[in-house]
Regions:
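Catalytic core of membrane glycerolipid acyltransferases/transacylases, capturing the structured
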Residues: 17, 57-130
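Alpha-helical membrane-targeting segments
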Residues: 18-41, 105-115, 208
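A short, well-structured juxtamembrane/interface segment
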Residues: 35-62
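Residue-level preference for the first positions of well-ordered beta-strands
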Residues: 62-64, 149-155, 190
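Short glycine-rich anion-binding loops that position phosphate/pyrophosphate groups of nucleotides
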Residues: 69-71, 157-160
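A cross-family acyltransferase "interaction/gating" segment
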Residues: 109-110, 151, 159-230
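Glycine-rich anion/phosphate-binding loops
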Residues: 130-138
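A cross-taxonomic marker for long C-terminal extensions/tails that follow the last structured domain
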Residues: 144, 220, 227-250
Length: 250
């Protein structure tokens, strides 16, 4: 299938393409390795998180990776983190929800595709009603990819936190709907929260120094509630703990 233009008007073709798109795993690993060499995050684990994560990835159990969103470089920090954690084994088998603006420039589009990107049309750009159908289809595709054995990485705040990067913004139910749709199809994903901090002097979405971020990997959450909003509440609490860990370790 030819790669479609990523526009809201074309959302059905967009999600038909990303339902099956899979990047070259070798090239993806090279890209992630280069991002680690550039960004070199300093990774800290909760007590048994590293061993549990290694076992999960080895077993093939699918993960929803939730990370906080404080700069325009977070996706690169997260990719660099994946390279230097047990998540390395999942490179090429992880989808990343990414705002549609990242798919406009052809070169950036290619790079985001290499990272496993799936476009998201955000209500803050188009309005809630305009993106409703596209949003439902995006959640269906995301759940389907989980059911096929892919992991899913999400920045569930939805937009950069420009107020207080130490405190999460409100997390809506979208991540919960994706997890529930996967569970309804027989696959119960495990939540993995990853907190990111660029230090007390980092302000705004484009701080001067985004290298050597402090990254905190929480212990996986195996049992999620049944209702989407309840899942979102669990994510809010668990991800805040990860953010606290990243801030403390900076």
């Amino acid at each position: 299938m030819d790669k479609p233009e990523v526009t809201l008007e074309n959302y059905e073709a967009v999600y038909a393409y990303y339902r099956d798109h899979r990047q070259n795993r070798l090239l993806a690993k090279l890209a992630y390795a280069s991002l680690y060499a550039k960004y070199r995050p300093r990774i800290v684990y909760a007590d048994d998180a590293k061993a549990q994560l290694a076992g999960l990835v080895k077993s093939g159990r699918v993960l929803i990776v939730a990370a906080n969103h404080v700069t325009h470089s977070d996706q690169y920090t997260l990719a660099a983190t994946a390279w230097n954690t047990p998540l390395r084994r999942a490179i090429g088998r992880t989808r990343v929800l990414a705002k549609d603006e990242l798919f406009v420039d052809p070169d950036l589009h290619r790079k985001v595709d290499m990272m496993g990107g799936i476009p998201v049309f955000r209500s803050k750009n188009y309005g809630l009603r305009a993106v409703a159908d596209a949003g439902r289809l995006m959640m269906d595709i995301s759940a389907e990819r989980l059911c096929r054995g892919d992991n899913l990485a999400i920045f569930p705040e939805g937009t950069c936190n420009e107020d207080d990067p130490t405190r999460l913004q409100h997390i809506n139910s979208g991540i919960g709907h994706i997890a529930k749709r996967a569970a309804d199809r027989g696959v119960s994903p495990v939540l993995l929260s990853i907190g990111i901090s660029y230090g007390p002097d980092a302000h705004g979405p484009d701080p001067e120094n985004v290298k050597s971020a402090s990254v905190f990997v929480s212990e996986p959450v195996f049992d999620l509630p049944a209702k989407p909003m309840d899942i979102a509440h669990v994510v809010q609490k668990d991800l805040q703990i990860a953010v606290d860990g990243a801030v403390a370790a900076y």
